C-alpha cells in the first residue's frame, strides 16, 4: 500500500516524525504546562531523543507495530506545533485510542481539531477500527472540549483511578463508533 504521508489539511501538514524534530519536541515536552495533566513531568532532551527514535518507526499499524504517531506542522512556516497519535488497544475487538499534545502557543486556534480529525479518519477508514476512545484528566478542560468537538461522546468519569506524580487523579473517557463517524462524515458532505 502506498504511503499516505504527508497528509495535508487546510492549514497543517501531518507527517512521520524525523530526527530533526528534536528541538521542536523538546520545546513542547520540556514544558511543565504541557505535562501537567500527563503521567510524567517535563522531559529532558535525552528523553525526547529516545522518544523520537521510537516515534520515527510509528508510521502505520501493522502486525509489528500498533501505533501511528505524526508530527503536525503549520503550512508555510513548517513549524512543528504538535504530536498526534492513534493506536490499537485491541486487535480482537477492533478498538483504538487517540492522543494529542499541542504547543501552548498554538492552542485555541482549531489546529488540534484539524489534526485529530485526520487521526480519527485514519483509525476508522484506513485501519478499520470499530471504536476509538480518548482519555484525559478531568481538570484538562481543553482536551475534554476537543474530544467533544470531534463528536466523541463522554462515556465515563473514573474517580481517582491513577496515581500520577504522587496525586490520585481521575480520568474522563470519550469514544466514537465507526457508525457515528460515518454518519458525521455523511452530514458534513450533505
Language model features with spans:
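GNAT-family acyltransferases
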Residues: 1-105, 122, 126, 167-190
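Conserved catalytic-core motifs of GNAT/GCN5-like acyltransferases
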Residues: 17, 133-135, 153-170
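Conserved acetyl-CoA-binding loop-helix of GNAT-fold acetyltransferases
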Residues: 100-102, 108-125, 141-149
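Positions that flank functional sites
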Residues: 44, 139, 162
Amino acid at each position: 500500500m502506498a504511503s499516505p504521508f504527508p497528509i495535508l489539511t487546510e492549514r497543517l501538514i501531518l507527517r512521520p516524525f524525523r530526527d530533526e524534530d528534536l528541538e521542536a519536541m523538546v520545546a513542547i515536552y520540556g514544558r511543565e504546562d504541557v505535562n501537567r495533566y500527563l503521567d510524567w513531568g517535563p522531559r529532558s532532551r535525552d528523553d525526547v531523543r529516545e522518544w523520537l527514535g521510537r516515534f520515527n518507526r510509528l508510521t502505520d499499524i501493522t502486525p509489528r507495530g500498533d501505533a501511528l504517531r505524526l508530527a503536525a506542522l503549520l503550512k508555510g512556516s513548517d513549524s512543528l506545533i504538535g504530536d498526534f497519535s492513534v493506536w490499537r488497544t485491541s486487535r480482537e475487538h477492533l478498538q483504538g485510542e487517540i492522543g494529542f499534545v499541542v504547543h501552548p502557543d498554538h492552542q485555541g486556534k482549531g489546529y488540534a481539531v484539524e489534526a485529530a480529525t485526520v487521526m480519527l479518519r485514519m483509525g476508522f477508514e484506513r485501519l478499520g477500527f470499530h471504536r476509538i476512545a480518548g482519555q484525559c484528566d478531568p481538570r484538562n478542560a481543553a482536551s475534554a472540549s476537543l474530544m467533544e468537538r470531534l463528536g466523541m461522546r463522554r462515556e465515563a468519569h473514573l474517580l481517582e483511578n491513577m496515581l500520577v506524580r504522587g496525586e490520585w487523579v481521575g480520568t474522563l473517557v470519550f469514544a466514537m463508533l465507526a457508525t457515528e463517524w460515518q454518519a458525521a462524515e455523511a452530514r458534513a458532505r450533505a
